[in-house]
Regions:
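Basic, flexible Lys/Arg- and Gly-enriched helix-loop patches that mediate nucleic-acid binding at interfaces
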Residues: 1-233
Length: 233
C-alpha cells in the first residue's frame, strides 16, 4: 500500500492533508522521516506521525452502550442516532449499526463499516446469539419456557427458531432471553403470544462478547481483534 493512502486510512485525513504532513517531515517509516507519498509499505513496516505509531485498520468495530431514546440507524432527521454518539471520531468511515435495538431499548450495539461481518452476525445461518435482560409485566411461566424452547409461532403465523428464557428475579418478572435470529420487535411479540408485556429490554451480549460494564449509557470504545473474534466464536 502507498504511504499516502495508508495515512489517509489510519490517520483519518484526506490525501491532501497526508501530503502536507509528509512535506513537513511529520511522518516516520521504521523510525526514519519519509516525505514520499508513493512509498510502498510492506506488512512489517511501522509508520508514525509526530512519533506516535499508527495502526492500520481495514475496518472499525465499536461497542456502544445505547441509551434509551436513541435510534439504531446511521442517520435520522428527527432523532439522535447511535452513529451520532460517535461524533467526528471517524470522519472517513461509513459506520452503521450491525442489527438494531428499538428506540426504548438499551444496551450493546455493534457499530462497524464491515458489511461482510455484519451480514455474518445477523444471518440466521451463523447462529450468532444475542443475550438480553428483559423486564416483563407478569411472572415467567412454564408455558413460556416450553414455548420459547420449542420455537414460538407469532400472531401473524411467523414460526421462530427456538430461544432460551430463564428467570433472573424471585418474582419471575426479570428474565434472560437468548435469541439466534432477528425479527422485528421479536421479544415483545414472543411474550405477547402469552399475554405478557415488555417493560424494559437491555442487550447484554452479542455472541461470546458481553457489554463492557465500564461503559456508561452513550459511551463507546473500539474492540480489539480478540473481542471481535469472540462475537462469532
Amino acid at each position: 500500500m502507498r504511504l499516502d493512502k495508508y495515512l489517509a486510512e489510519t490517520a483519518q485525513c484526506t490525501r491532501g492533508e497526508a501530503k502536507t504532513m509528509l512535506a513537513k517531515g511529520r511522518v516516520q517509516v521504521n523510525g526514519a522521516v519519509c516525505k514520499k507519498g508513493d512509498t510502498q509499505l510492506k506488512e512489517t513496516d511501522t509508520v508514525a506521525v509526530d512519533g506516535a505509531p499508527l495502526r492500520y485498520q481495514k475496518f472499525v468495530y465499536l461497542m456502544l452502550n445505547k441509551p434509551e431514546g436513541v435510534v439504531s440507524a446511521s442517520t435520522d432527521k428527527r432523532d439522535t442516532t447511535v452513529v451520532d454518539l460517535v461524533g467526528d471520531a471517524y470522519p472517513r468511515r461509513e459506520l452503521f449499526p450491525a442489527g438494531r435495538l428499538d428506540k426504548t431499548s438499551t444496551g450493546f450495539v455493534l457499530l462497524t463499516d464491515d458489511g461482510g461481518f455484519a451480514h455474518d452476525i445477523l444471518s440466521p445461518r451463523h447462529h450468532v446469539s444475542k443475550t438480553y435482560t428483559v423486564t416483563i409485566d407478569t411472572p415467567l411461566t412454564q408455558e413460556m419456557r416450553t414455548g420459547f424452547a420449542a420455537g414460538v409461532t407469532l400472531a401473524d403465523g411467523t414460526a421462530l427458531s427456538p430461544a432460551e428464557v430463564t428467570a433472573l428475579s424471585p418474582d419471575g418478572c426479570t428474565v434472560r432471553v437468548v435469541l439466534r435470529q432477528g425479527v422485528y420487535h421479536q421479544i415483545k411479540r414472543m411474550f405477547g403470544v402469552y399475554g405478557a408485556g415488555v417493560n424494559a429490554l437491555h442487550r447484554e451480549a452479542i455472541g461470546g462478547l458481553a457489554l463492557d460494564a465500564q461503559l456508561a449509557p452513550g459511551q463507546w470504545r473500539e474492540l480489539s481483534d480478540e473481542e471481535v473474534a469472540k462475537i462469532t466464536r
